[in-house]
Amino acid sequence: MPTKIRISKDMILDAAFEIARQEGMEKLSNRELAKKLKCSIRPIYYQFENVEEMQKELYIKIEQYFYEFLLDNMVEGIPQYKQIGINYIRFAKREKQLFQTVQIKFS
């Protein structure tokens, strides 16, 4: 009978997202992830072939969060382009580390 997976891919990505959000992408490592998840680095390598694969999926998660943030809280009567601009500035203020990641990754 195969062993039960206790650390899922989603759990790893969520922990990586929180590290990137609080401390920045430069602090993200398998050791930091393992520490946050309270496990060894083995489950991380079990779910992802390498760090690049995990980072690729993390960038997708960050990008989705960024676009959802931009499109949230739309108010009727205000042009959409203005609201997106305001939300862009809000994102930069509230999510400093993720904003840097978005700017570096997509510039």
Question: Language-model features: where?
Answer:
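N-terminal intrinsically disordered/low-complexity leader segments
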Residues: M1-I7
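Tryptophan-centric aromatic hotspots in well-structured domains and transmembrane helices
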Residues: T3, F48-E49, G85
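Alpha-helix N-cap/helix-start motif at coil-to-helix transitions, marked by capping-box chemistry
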Residues: R6, R31, I60, A92-K93
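Helix-turn-helix
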Residues: M11, I19-E53, E57
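Alpha-helical structural segments
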Residues: M11-E18, E53-P79, Q83-R90, K105
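Alpha-helix N-cap and coil->helix boundary residues
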Residues: L28-S29, Q80-Q83, Q97
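Short secondary-structure transition hinges
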Residues: R90, R94-S107
